[in-house]
Amino acid sequence: MDGTASPIQLTECGKKYIKTAEKIMDLENEFAYYVGNLQELKTGRLSVGGTYLFSSFIFPPIIDKFRRAYPHVKLNLFEGHTPLLEQKLFAGELDIIIDNYLLDAGIYEKERFMEERLLLAVPSSFDSNRRAVKYQLKASDIKRCLHQNDTFPAVSLKKFKDEPFVMLRSHNDTRERVDAILGRAGIQLNYTLKLNQLLTTYHLTEYGMGASFVSDTVVKCLPENPDIIYYKIDDPEAVRDVYLYYKKNKYLTRSMIEFIKMAIPGIEKNSEKYV
């Protein structure tokens, strides 16, 4: 205060202090309003990622449901191969990814999304099918999960060892599992092409260019093709889980929580962090 003035007035420093205090209060109120909107999902952003298969067929209905429920949250979808997805998840560029590859449990939290099974897909024109009639499955059988029935027989891969195969390249979960399956079966296959995407191998099988190993997720998501015959594989590596991943010790935003709850209904009943 300036005691020499009449009436008593604030000094310039005092006036500056009051103005600064008012600005701080305004910022606090603005931040509280922003946090309130974040908690109510009236604002914010969420970045999710997956391989081409999951980005094309698994994420869209979840994203559509989320956007309808929370239209003010900006949701980004990134598509890429597993190493790139993990790189972006680690860097914080993605909040959540979906993948069937087991990531480092010391770095990432995971929640089980679904189970999928590997199948042998063979062009119907291949002669080897004649030796395996009782093991054959159609796409409609896969869609009603007949291959998951313990009483349905699995085929011996040796029946197809002389056929051409299209295969995924190394450093891929499907390829690693197939290598383990073939190793246990004691057979080597004739790989005519090596590719990067599971869907690409499937499409080449559709064109009769080679047999392939595909997930039942692919068969369930795509239109039925009578030119492909499917076979059940009896091996532990033929069954795998698909997970939602996010970085360990990362703050779980309300948008992340709600997205995970929509993707995995009922998860909040088993974990308090999603309540």
Where would I find each of the regions flagged by the language model?
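Short amphipathic alpha-helical coupling segments at ligand-binding clamshell hinges
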Residues: 13, 17-20, 62, 177-178, ...
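Central regulatory/effector-binding core of bacterial HTH transcription factors
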Residues: 43-106, 195
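Alpha-helical linker/hinge and terminal dimerization helices associated
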Residues: 17-39, 270-273
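Short beta-strand-centered segments that line the small-molecule binding cleft or hinge
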Residues: 62-65, 83-139, 209, 229-231
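A short LG(V/I)-centered, amphipathic sequence patch enriched
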Residues: 1-12
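A late-sequence structural motif
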Residues: 58, 216-218, 228-273
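Hydrophobic hinge/microswitch elements
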Residues: 81-85, 90-94, 100, 171-227
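Secondary-structure junction motif
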Residues: 128-130, 135-185, 252-254, 260, ...
